[in-house]
Every structure is written in C-alpha cells, then in structure tokens.
Amino acid sequence: MLLEGRKLLITGVLTDRSIAYFVARRAQEEGAEVILTGFGRGLRITKRMAKRLHTEADVLELDVNDPAQLEAVAGTLDERWGSLDGILHAIAFVPADGMGGQFLQTPSASAVAAFETSAFSLKALAAALLPLLERGESASIVGLDFDASVAWPAYDWAGVSKAALESINRYLARDLGPRGVRSNLVAAGPLQTVAASNIEGFEGLAQVWERQAPLGWDLSDPTPVADACLFLLSPLARAITGEILHVDGGVHALGAAVPDGAASEAAAGDEARTAS
C-alpha cells in the first residue's frame, strides 16, 4: 500500500466533506496511522469526524498560533510514535472584514490575523515538529492552497495569505531539504466545503471552474485533491519539494476563458479538414 506504516498528523478535519477528512480516510485505506488535531469549539466536531473514519483516530487539541500547544502536540507525538512521516496543513482563517470585496478597507490587524493563521502557521507547525520529522522516513509536509498567482474576486486577504503560504513553502523547501524533509502544496479547485461556504462570491468561482476546466471539475468530489496529497505524502514523491501541485481540472493553465462553443466548433473544423 502507498502509505503502509507511515505516521501522519492531519489538521483541519471539521466535516466529512472536507479535503482533510478525505485525506485522513484515504491515508488509512493506504496503510497509514493517522492522528487528527482540532481547536476550540471545532474540537468536538473533529472528534465526531474521527469516529467516522475506517479506524477511529485520536484527536489532539491544537491552536496552531499557540506555541505551548504546538510543544504539547510535539511531546504527545514523541511519546506515541517517536517519529513523524507526514503532516497535512489544512488551516486557514480570514476575518470577515478581510474578504468580500473589502480589500482597501481591511485594517492591518485583520490582515495580520489572516497571515498568521493561514500562512505563518505552516512554518510554525513545521518548526515545532521538525525533530520528529527528521526521524521519519522521507518525511513530507503538505499544505492546502488555492492558486495565488492572480487576484480572484472577493478573495482579498485570503488570496494575499495564500500567496504568503506559497512563498513560505519555498523557504521551507530550502531549509528543510538538507534535513530530509519535503514541503509541498496542493492548489485545489473550488469545492463545496465549510470553508468555501464562508467565501463571498464562491458561486461565481464555482461557475468559472464548471465552465472552463479542460478536464471538467466536480465541486462535490474532494477525492482527486486528497489523492494528490497522498502522493506527496508518500515516498513516491521523495525527490519533489517546494512544488505547488495544481489539482483544478486544468484551469490554472488557461490564459483566458474559452468562449462557449469554441471547442466544439474547432473540433468540427478539424473533422471537416480531415474529410476533405
């Protein structure tokens, strides 16, 4: 199996439709041992989701912005496993005044809060668990991303934070590679998750993907994204670090929208030329 015997810490499981939940479930199917983390009021929800996995997973409390809790999680994992083979970073938060077309009005405190939780936390988690990762086998950190190469409507400081996340990923790759630890991101297309429901303008983004993705895009299926995460968490990706793997049906590769009917007209033209 792809992840046989690997020990993984997975953050961000809040519903059984979340990408993180699908990663945890698929990881167990591929032979991994999994521990989840939860925080605040969401901790109880994460514990409920842990019971729905193939094998119930333990849940550790973790506020990723609290150094004491990071240290406590590291201690628990050290006692339990003694090493760590992989981490899924599925953590993001943006205050309400940092999204929804309020980019110019967002106060610095909200921008900083978005950066700290959505981006800096990747570094914080990696640094806190590095001694365990160094003892792991081809250890891998995977973070969930949304393409930050362009400005999306209403995404605002979430987009800025994702851009920071992508930069942090590159610096982690630089600094952790010599210590045998990889760091990569998976830039997913939009999915109907709890996180997406909090994004004003999500329906517009969803329509872009449904209309333009060359491979098509199923808003209700996190499995392709989860499987990409499993690949990066596995030894098969042992020579890959600092990468952003787009799992979005190909939308990131398009320079402009394809007009409705253009693809079918082009195909019809090719057929006519072939016939002649």
What are these regions (language model features)?
Residues 10, 88, 142, 183-186, ...:
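Hydrophobic structural elements of the Rossmann-like NAD(P)H-binding subdomain
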Residues 51, 60-71, 75-80, 86-114, ...:
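Conserved mid-core segment of classical short-chain dehydrogenase/reductases
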Residues 74, 122, 126, 169-170, ...:
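Short-chain dehydrogenase/reductase
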Residues 2-36:
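Canonical Rossmann dinucleotide-binding motif of NAD(H)/NADP(H)-dependent dehydrogenases/reductases
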Residues 120, 185, 203-240, 245-249, ...:
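C-terminal helical subdomain
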Residues 12-21, 92-130, 134-178, 190-193, ...:
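Catalytic loop of short-chain dehydrogenase/reductase
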Residues 241-276:
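Short C-terminal tail/terminal secondary-structure segment
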Residues 28, 82, 134-135, 174-179, ...:
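A short hydrophobic alpha-helix cap/turn motif
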